[in-house]
Amino acid sequence: MILKIADNIYSPMGFTTAENYAAVKQGRSMLESYPAGTMDLPEAFTASLFHWDEVEMTDGCTPFESIVIQSVGRALAQTTVDVSSDRVLFILSTTKGNVHLLDSRSPRFPEERVLLGEAAATVTRHFGFSRTPLVVSNACISGLSAQITAMRLLESGACDIAVVCGADIQSRFIISGFGSFKALSPMECRPFDIERLGLNLGEAAATIIYTRSETQGEKGQWQAVSGAVRNDAFHISGPSPKGEGSYRAIRAAMGDTAPDELAFINVHGTSTMYNDEMESAAIDRAGLLDIPVNSLKGYYGHTMGAAGVLETILSMAAVDDGTILGTRGYEELGVSHKVKLSAQNAPTTKQAFLKLLSGFGGCNAAMGFRRRS
């Protein structure tokens, strides 16, 4: 049994899970409009970005490494985990890491720090982990891929504790890249809405700590029940219109869970025309149209490598609170399959949920979680 024993969300919304959940439940969003010229970009954009004067920077570390250290440290502080043990593994989920260093004229950091493995090693040295860290970088599904990897390693006995952190920060390189795809919305995103124009990007670090069994007197209320990654190889940047990969991941991740056990499905919900339509098709094919669906992108934007971890943690907090969080920005259904969305929070007594992500290259992931009584 794979159990969660601690977590943290470190974002522009707040530096603890409790702060983040309370703000989202109140309907707050950290999305802001930034004028042309920000990060030397030629066009205005909307995103959720850190105010870096509020972030505690770690000596000798980049901004990206610093937010990872802040989140991991806050999660570890909730436990008695001995990170120096060779049974404890650190897994970093990120899509771009320190890629901003490629655009930097500062000689402060050596060139190799742009490598994802070097960033992860910097974090493990800070805390004193003895094991070599593992990096999972699998486009937008990185956060679920990392958790599924942790599950499999724990189940195989390769480690006893897995500390999984998902994180990304934004840069001119990233924002201009999404802009070149015409995927960015100039205003706040509207997942699944008929007026949606595209996605917003965001920054965050989120950490979840799993154990193979209850150890050191710590109790885990949440179980990671199942997980699956499926790649339909439809297109390098566009999803399968039929949601083939997502459907197959859902089917595999559902396992023995009955649909009526689910409180909700927390979808990727990026607010792009193709993603939201594809996810609605996959949910329909899986026979889950009666299950409430929500997206959290209207609160944080797309936090990339952090998304799968951050949104899993918030979904756990919502079930703990007996709540289905509303989809900020949603008003009128704008996909062809009648998924069950609402902009408003709703009550629930159910104790399980399904988390979905999809990404470039045709990759798709799904995980099932259940709260233990």
What are these regions (language model features)?
Residues 158-180, 185-189, 196, 227-241, ...:
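Acyl-CoA/ACP chain-elongation machinery
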Residues 134-166, 201-218, 303-324, 341, ...:
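Active-site-proximal alpha-helical scaffold in enzymes
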